Amino acid sequence: MFKILRDDFSNLKWTGKVHLLALALLFVGVVTSKFLLSLGMIIGVGSLLMERDFKAYWIEIRANRFFLYLIIIYLLCFISLLWSQNLPYGLHDLRVKTSLVVIPLLLIVKPLKSNQLKNLLLLLFVSSIVISSLINFAVYQYAMSKDAIYDVRQMSLCGSHIRYGIIVAFGIGVCVHYYNALDKYKFTNVVVISWLVFYTYYSQVLAGLISLFIIIFLGGILYLIKKKKEKLVLGIVLFTLIITGFCCYALFVPETHKNISEHSDLVGMEKSWSVRSTYPFDSIDNKNQILKETLVRYLDSKALANDSIGVEKLSEKDIRNIENGYADIHETESGLIARYYGLRYQIHEAKNPNGHSLLQRLSSWSSAWNITKDHWIMGVGVGDVADAFVLQYEKEHSLLREENRLRAHNNY
């Protein structure tokens, strides 16, 4: 294999070798570094301009309908500058969106003909995911042991934990797709898949879990359709719908909790708490939640009385958990169980959206919908999107703090 790979690389023109380098930087940079990603785009565009085979580029572009749709969307954003008042922001936003066009352009206009070189790029992609995830996990475990980190979302050192979680799911999909093609490396492939599945589970990134589920589900369905197993496909679809319905029921059906003022000895709790912690009883925890409410719910989750004796029975680790905003002992666990209880708390108990990813996103979506209703034909223009959100948040007297008043979507 390595001899074939070496021969394929040797047969490339110098511009082809530069283009391959650019693609390698893209495949590594999309996982680990914006700098490498930007460098790959610059080198890639430069190699295309040096080769100057514009006729061949145009043929490839015309043959790819998906890329044509991307160009149309980008052009519509550009045209919206005509009715944008904040031109500097609009130009900045278009510059950021350029990567959505440039990266597909580099992959489409000069496709690699060698399967070995394609596999090399995918190997770089998966290797970057494995190495970065191992570093993330090791650093997180060390920081946890030193009480320097209290939120699993801080585990990603490569930018957004949501974006990284989705990339990990794609990496698993690549490994599964090439499982049968790697006869000599099946054991290694199984180890890599197992590690990345564990990382996805442990990191609690809901977008990553959903992406992994979709990849496995659609991949399995397409495989069974190819094998003409229609009845099995129908059974899997029905089973998936039932499980999805059960999960939604488990999340959204509320639990009954006792009222904090009627069933809690707040005076006794405050006296014992002041001995155990430096955080004032009437203050907020590290997730900006009312600390005494976090304490009551944490005591409930451990089946302890809401009084001074219950507080005294808490361990030092429990005290740190409460200070860090964990309202349920189950939230301190790893994986889906912790995420499940965290989501239930957000849906049924949390009154302040700050510090809660789901509630912050729902609040932003609500503001975005109201902006859309006011400008449903032409929009506000790409330059005025951020300003429109600022005005809408003020108009609605949003509970979101200024640093959390973001636009309602991520560009991926």
Task: Label each region the model flagged.
Residues 66-73, 87-110, 120-124, 129, ...:
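Aromatic-anchored transmembrane helix interface
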Residues 1-85, 116-119, 123, 178-187, ...:
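Transmembrane signal-anchor hairpin modules in multi-pass inner-membrane enzymes, especially those
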